[in-house]
Each structure stands twice: as structure tokens, then as C-alpha cells.
A protein has these predicted regions:
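N-terminal beta1-alpha1 cap of cysteine-dependent amidohydrolase-like domains
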Residues: 1-81, 217-279
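Short glycine-/acidic-enriched loop or helix-start segments at secondary-structure transitions
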Residues: 13-15, 39, 59-61, 94-96, ...
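Hydrophobic/aromatic beta-strand patches that form the interior of the parallel beta-sheet core
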Residues: 3, 28-30, 49, 84, ...
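Glycine-rich, phosphate-binding/catalytic loops in enzymes
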Residues: 19-22, 64-68, 100-102, 172-173, ...
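Surface-exposed, flexible loop/turn segments at secondary-structure boundaries
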Residues: 10, 35, 56, 91, ...
Length: 279
């Protein structure tokens, strides 16, 4: 069993769930947005995924479950449980472990397709390197430049960002608009980008970010819920452009996501086996 925490309805597990199912695991879905409590560590199973959301990592007043999530993430890292934390999840993980998240990021928002700039550590990392290798191979097959395996296109959509990593963590990737894009703490892999997302989903997010920038709506959470009929044409066009850019790099996006699912499941099974032998 792998537990998936989905903070909001507009940032679903998407095709990452399909890829995890394809690896033969059972997913336990936890949805704070519908009233689910953050589970106790003993209920997690063999792995954890924490997804994104429009709320900030500091928004305990409106989302009191964030405090319980921080506590769970600390325990996950201490016990070396395989985990993936995405966007908001990565920001909450940084806060939980002693780092800092800026809301909003001093580097500004990021949306659409950006290039990950992989660190030297990424190629040797015990959790990340296999994922990178598979994504780079897919890029080469599709004729997408990687600068000798040091760059990868990914989908992003965020206003906030980690500005100081916790001690003892490994920086794995940056981007021009986000110095901390990917990092690891123990068996937890934290990703600012959205490997679960699709070109259609980034079209949805980008259009609403553009509408917010145009003053149509205030606040990221309100923008996420904006109906299509209320989007100005300029915002619709921004979303369409983002979708086209994502479709161009879809082979890499899929390869990264499938490899992420496979790596998480492999590590979760190893954790379960090790835990069983020590009982």
C-alpha cells in the first residue's frame, strides 16, 4: 500500500496514479479538501506521495491539517520510508525538516514548461539517477535537447518556492526561476515540478494563473476554481500556448513519471521486506 495525500481537488494524482497502479500497488487516497485527516505514521503503508495545492505551506489558519502533515513528513524521513513530495508537498517537507519556503517566491512565479538544470549529484543519486537516465533516453529518442544529459523539460505551476534547504539534504536540480527544483532527504524525493500532470492540466492551471494576473480573480485558490466561461480570451490563449509547449515534450514527461512510479514502488517493496525481517 502507498498512501497518496491530495491537498486539493484541482491538483489530482492524475496519471501518476495510473503508473503506480501499473506497478501493482494499492493506493490509499487521503483528501484533506474533503475532510480526510492526515493519517498516523502507522497507517501509511510502504510509501507516501504528497501532491500539490494552491494553499501555501504557511497557511495553517485556513488549513490546520498542514501541522499534522509536517509531523508526518518528519517521521517519514526519520524512518527512511520511500516518499515523493510534489510542489506544495515539497515546500511543506522543507518547512518540516528545518528549511524555508517563501510565499511568494522572491524569484517570481513559474508556469508552463521549464528546463531542469540537473546538479552533478543528480547523476549519482540513489533515488533520482534512474529516473533521470530514463527521461534523458526518452529525450534523445524524441530529438529533444538535454545538453549532454544535464537538462530536462518539466511542467511547473507555482508562486511559492523553497529558498533554504534543510541541513543534510541533497540538491538535485534547479531552474532559472527556482533555484530549488528537486532535492532529497533520506528516502524522500522532493520535486517542485509536476510529474503527475498532463498538457491538458497545465493548460487549465496556466489559464487561471493568467486570469489572476489580469485581475479577474484574487488569490490562487479562487483562481483554481474559476470556470472556463469566466476566463478572458487572453488567459485562454496563455493556457493553449502552455499546452502546446507541454505536448512537444510529452515523451520526456511520460518517461520521467513512469520511472518515478517504478522507482517509488521498488523502494517501497524493499522497505516493506526490510521491515518484515526486523519484526
Amino acid at each position: 500500500v502507498i498512501t497518496v495525500i491530495e491537498p486539493e481537488a484541482f491538483a489530482p494524482v492524475g496519471r501518476l496514479g495510473e503508473w503506480l497502479f501499473a506497478e501493482g500497488v494499492t493506493l490509499r487516497m487521503v483528501r484533506p479538501w474533503s475532510g480526510d485527516a492526515i493519517p498516523d505514521f502507522s497507517e501509511i503503508g510502504s510509501g507516501l506521495v504528497v501532491l500539490g495545492g494552491a494553499m501555501s505551506a504557511h497557511d495553517d489558519a485556513d488549513h490546520p491539517w498542514l501541522a499534522d502533515l509536517r509531523g508526518l513528513l518528519r517521521r517519514i524521513v526519520d524512518e527512511r520510508v520511500p516518499a515523493v513530495a510534489i510542489c506544495l508537498g515539497a515546500q511543506v517537507a522543507a518547512e518540516a525538516l528545518g528549511g524555508d519556503t517563501a510565499c511568494p517566491s522572491p524569484h517570481g512565479p513559474e508556469g508552463g514548461v521549464v528546463e531542469l538544470e540537473l546538479t552533478e549529484a543528480a547523476g549519482q543519486d540513489a533515488v533520482f539517477s534512474d529516473i533521470v537516465d530514463e527521461a534523458v533516453r526518452a529525450a534523445v529518442r524524441a530529438g529533444i535537447p538535454t545538453r549532454d544529459g544535464t537538462r530536462l523539460p518539466v511542467i511547473v505551476s507555482h508562486d511559492d518556492g523553497v529558498v533554504r534547504l534543510p541541513e543534510g539534504t541533497t540538491l538535485l536540480a534547479s531552474s532559472p526561476g527556482s533555484p530549488v527544483q528537486a532535492w532529497r532527504a533520506g528516502k524522500l524525493l522532493a520535486l517542485q515540478h509536476h510529474p503527475e500532470s498532463t498538457p491538458a492540466r497545465i493548460e487549465y492551471w496556466r489559464a487561471r494563473s493568467a486570469a489572476r494576473a489580469l485581475g479577474v480573480v484574487e488569490g490562487e485558490e479562487a483562481a483554481e476554481a474559476l470556470p472556463d466561461a469566466d476566463l478572458p480570451q487572453e488567459a485562454v490563449a496563455a493556457g493553449a500556448r502552455a499546452r502546446v509547449e507541454a505536448e512537444k515534450v510529452e515523451p520526456v514527461l511520460q518517461a520521467f513519471g513512469r520511472a518515478l512510479a517504478r522507482t517509488l514502488v521498488r523502494n517501497a517493496r524493499a522497505y516493506r521486506t526490510a521491515a518484515a525481517t526486523t519484526r
